[in-house]
């Protein structure tokens, strides 16, 4: 199988108090997540962000919970955080998702960009 080295997503904006599935594994694909860039757009408050690797639920996207959370990050005002595990996070099953939760209560969103490889 060939690897497509790419941004796995466009820049996603995740609103306050919401969760967004930013990467979903397609049929017969393997996804390797190398980095997640998270930027806090708020100039006055730290935003807490949760990263979830959520297994599929009968072939479709599952729901994030405390059992799927792999990181919780407090991103400072107007700051950017790079989540770069030593080895890529591998998602193999159709419908597996990377979900980002913005716990913020402010009105400001965060921006998220995911990079890695897609086996095609």
Language model feature labels by segment:
Residues 37-39:
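Short edge beta-strand/loop segments characteristic of extracellular beta-sandwich folds
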Residues 43-67:
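Short, surface-exposed beta-strand/strand-loop-strand elements in extracellular ectodomains
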Residues 19-21, 35, 82-86:
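Short structured motifs
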Residues 1-31, 41, 55-57, 94-95, ...:
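C-terminal interaction-tip segments
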Residues 34, 45-50, 108-110:
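Short beta-strand/loop motifs in extracellular/secreted proteins, especially
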Residues 58-96:
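Intrinsically disordered, low-complexity Pro/Gly/Ser/Thr-rich segments with frequent PxxP/GP/PP motifs
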Residues 8, 53, 83-86:
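Selective for proline/serine-rich intrinsically disordered segments
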